[in-house]
Amino acid sequence: AATQVGYHALTYATFPSQILGGPTWTQARISDEPVLSAGDYVDVLVAFNKEAYDTHSEEVKPQGVIIYNSDDFQLEGDDRSFGLPIEELARSTGNTRAANMVVIGALAHLVDMPQGYLDEFVEKRFRRGRDGDDEIIQSNIQAMVLGRTHTSESGFTLGRLAEPQMPEYQQIMVKGNEALSLGARAAGLEFYIGYPISPATTILIWMEHNLIGDGKFAYQVSSEIESITGLLGAGFAGKKAMTATAGPGFSLMSEGLGL
């Protein structure tokens, strides 16, 4: 929503490579000027659980704000914080998946971002020609408005962002894995083989949709060992080949690396 109206943005997300899952977090920076790094501190922390607060509260600037999920835990003694019943508000819209939209509405209030920016984005994002599009769009907008309203009642604010200026050139919002995949494709990649593991899974998905035709293809295997041995085999056969994995997956590949 921010980039569509001319703001610059940078996001960074962490998804642990664990079978049982683990703590995940996403960091976003938005500015009217180019954003060159993620930075060391944040203006706002949204903690969905106590672990998130305990882990990241020290990263919040002294004049920053902490929003905590009061449906999950209570926080006392930190005058930078206020509770937001994120899950309860999402349920009240009839869309239990709208918790993140509640948070977006809360953040929009803190920086005084016009609701129209958000509404326009939701309309574009969820208008897909399906029978339930109207209901989905309205529930998400309602969730944002509820988050904004509850946050306004808290009295917290960070001041309004400077008005965005649409650049003369076209801005592109691209994910890191997508940019990497585009680069590999442009470099002549012919064969991609991989096993789904975070955060490499999105590379595999992109390749399955885009590495097609002219003898090029992507292949999902059932283990990391198959992935590395298949990669080596393709290389020996003269193909420009590629795989991607994470720490645990790379450890499993060590057997194949010995070839």
Which residues does each PLM region occupy?
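Active-site cofactor/cluster-binding pocket
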Residues: 1-187, 191
